[in-house]
Amino acid sequence: MMTIDNRVADVFSRRMAIQSVAALLLGSTVGVAQAQLPMSTAFNRAARNRILSQRLAKTYCQLLLGVLPEFSAKTLADVRQQVRTGFDELAKTSMPPDLASRVADLKKLADAADALLVFPPTREAVSAVAQQAEKVMAASQSTAEAFEKIAKVGSAKLINLAGRQRAVSQRIALDYFLIAAKLDGKGLQEQMKADMAEVRKGLETLAAAPVSTPAIRNELELGRAQWLFFEAAMQRAPDGKGMETVATTSERLAEVLDKLTDLYDGALKEVLG
């Protein structure tokens, strides 16, 4: 059995190793560091484009279908602003060349998606936005994985995992609305089933993870409960009431999982000191 002294030594050793990585990533100049995001938060900001891309396409499709027009328009405007703010914050972060290049490429894809949103939500426009959103999500996923490899700490993996669940849940909702708009292409139903299974497994993995706090456990329970509401909503026919229910439950799920991901970000910052 590990003694208290051994545990303290182990924690201290781990903290020193993580801080060494943090120092390498964040830079040694105090003035620069103060102007930059913590690397864990930069990781979260870049990875957040997974969920933001799907929410953009989802709410744009909701506008096409006439689902809660005022709510959908406000959500779309808010998400577009979050994308811009996120990249503005990332521009303040010093990072290795490979990561900087990935973030720059990701921004180009996100800008292209945003440019499409100036057009009215026709079927053709919604289809184009959905396709571009998938490109943004793929690029954001690879960027998140690159951040995780550099960080080499368990909390980074959890930020990535929690962040992916929030994104995949929104892709499920987007697919529901694409089907309602009769824009469901080949393989969409299979993707929805796979995504549903991925979120269930992801939430189970997070629940079993050793990195936890009371706040994380509470938010995770809220997330799992909200997921059940969302699953039930997804069983409804895509009529007026059904689409409204999916729109509201998916946004509530996004809110909870976004907060959960931010809590993992906070836990990593505490470890980094």
Explain the meaning of each model-derived region:
Residues 1-12, 20-30:
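N-terminal secretory signal peptides
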Residues 5, 12-13, 48, 164:
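Intrinsically disordered, low-complexity sequence elements enriched in Ser/Thr/Gly/Pro
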Residues 31-35:
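Sec/Tat signal peptide C-region and signal peptidase I cleavage site
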Residues 36-273:
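Mature extracytoplasmic or organellar-lumen-exposed domains after removal of signal/transit peptides
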